[in-house]
């Protein structure tokens, strides 16, 4: 039976609850325990799948096709435990479930209320799989005091009462601001945050305090006194140069020991942190630097491409180099020469995205990489842009484009080498879609198999010809142009098992030019870099010696 750790936040948002949860999960694993991490988001969207990247950051897709919060990416990267649909939920999904049950008559005519019906739905979600792991870590999104979060805070209060004494603990993450004028860390915001938490029936067992530096003993004792926690349960979460040193930093602060003490687990198994020591060594001691341009649409918000940035870091670790990322707005050279914007980079990556804005710039970036022999990785839309570029400039199909852009404009302007995907095979059944369907949850989502061409660069990278990768797209490259493109050197080196859907293209006689329809960044980890990112950074490293 699992022990439950509820992670809440106060004072301000974006303090790093997700990272703290992920790091704690990794530390518990290092002591031999099994863990599962969950995110409960109070927003009213059913899931983040239709939210703007500027609003929410990236959407993290699981093997079973759930569109989830980017924090689940941190959970997977730090613990290696694949997330699923049962690891992410929102108020929107909770209320949808409750209302569907009411329509079916499941509540037998009762008046539907937040308590008990909504809170029971939340508790039922938390309980899923409780017998499968030693520890269940549940992060509540937002901050204490948010109106949207009240049903979740009430639900976890009830949940802790429903369970046996000592089966649940609460970890509260707050901010300790440093006032330069007085040279002091201020504890008052944390005291008020804990006061707010206690007013709704929750008392923290552990305080994790985000700060620029260490917490002096005087302030630690003050927090312990006024927030009613043990001094050794006041944990400093200091600013770090890399998130991947967080497990070691939290261990030095005693977070994992404080958790085990709160549960009364003695003697505590000793941790094996060798994996994280190796990760920290690779991060802190690079043997070179490579510069990678990410040519995208949402470059003003780096969280929109969070997993890509992390996967590049993992590729750098594998090659003992630091990857310096430059965010390049694809719109800046839609109507001008891309060379001044892209010269000097050792590799170019074009990520996924939606809509026509910026696509001509991405096509130019693909052309620049192909003609200048610069390593190129195109992901999802980035692969489609590479195919359109090759169709226009190699296969003489001057008006090559995507149906997506025609649908957006409301008129036909392009020969669609990329078309709206209307059917595909998922497991043992066929999925059908049409233009005009609801946006939410209707893409080709989750893990799908692909078959690679023997002797291809991608088969060499993976070390096999059978792979499984995660997808999130509704447009696909049309195979009827395959022969014409392969004749000109754009090889279709990966296909769906039925041969209907192109999964990977690569350019013949190029140092490293690969486009993939899937999202390899979603499966990369610091201790297990994805083979495509490993080899992409290796190619950038080789190119750095030539530039």
Swiss-Prot record:
GO terms (BP aspect): 'de novo' CTP biosynthetic process; pyrimidine nucleobase biosynthetic process
EC annotation from Swiss-Prot or TrEMBL: 6.3.4.2
Chain sites annotated for binding Mg(2+): 71, 139
Residues engaged in binding ATP: 14-19, 71
Sites where the protein binds UTP: 13, 186-191, 222
Pathway note: Pyrimidine metabolism; CTP biosynthesis via de novo pathway; CTP from UDP: step 2/2
Lineage top rank: taxon: Bacteria
Start and end residues of each Glutamine amidotransferase type-1 domain: 291-546
Regulation: Allosterically activated by GTP, when glutamine is the substrate; GTP has no effect on the reaction when ammonia is the substrate. The allosteric effector GTP functions by stabilizing the protein conformation that binds the tetrahedral intermediate(s) formed during glutamine hydrolysis. Inhibited by the product CTP, via allosteric rather than competitive inhibition.
Record field: catalytic activity: UTP + L-glutamine + ATP + H2O = CTP + L-glutamate + ADP + phosphate + 2 H(+); L-glutamine + H2O = L-glutamate + NH4(+); UTP + NH4(+) + ATP = CTP + ADP + phosphate + 2 H(+)
Gene Ontology MF, one: ATP binding
Catalytic residues identified in the record: 380 (nucleophile), 519, 521
Transmembrane regions listed in the UniProt entry: none
Keywords associated with the record: ATP-binding, Glutamine amidotransferase, Ligase, Magnesium, Metal-binding, Nucleotide-binding, Pyrimidine biosynthesis
Residues binding CTP, per UniProt: 13, 146-148, 186-191, 222
Positions that bind L-glutamine: 353, 381-384, 404, 474
PANTHER family xref list: CTP SYNTHASE (PTHR11550), CTP SYNTHASE-RELATED (PTHR11550:SF0)
Any further remark recorded for this protein: CTPSs have evolved a hybrid strategy for distinguishing between UTP and CTP. The overlapping regions of the product feedback inhibitory and substrate sites recognize a common feature in both compounds, the triphosphate moiety. To differentiate isosteric substrate and product pyrimidine rings, an additional pocket far from the expected kinase/ligase catalytic site, specifically recognizes the cytosine and ribose portions of the product inhibitor.
Quaternary structure note: Homotetramer.
Family: Belongs to the CTP synthase family.
Name of the protein in question: CTP synthase
Organism in which the protein naturally occurs: Jannaschia sp. (strain CCS1)
Gene name tied to this protein: pyrG
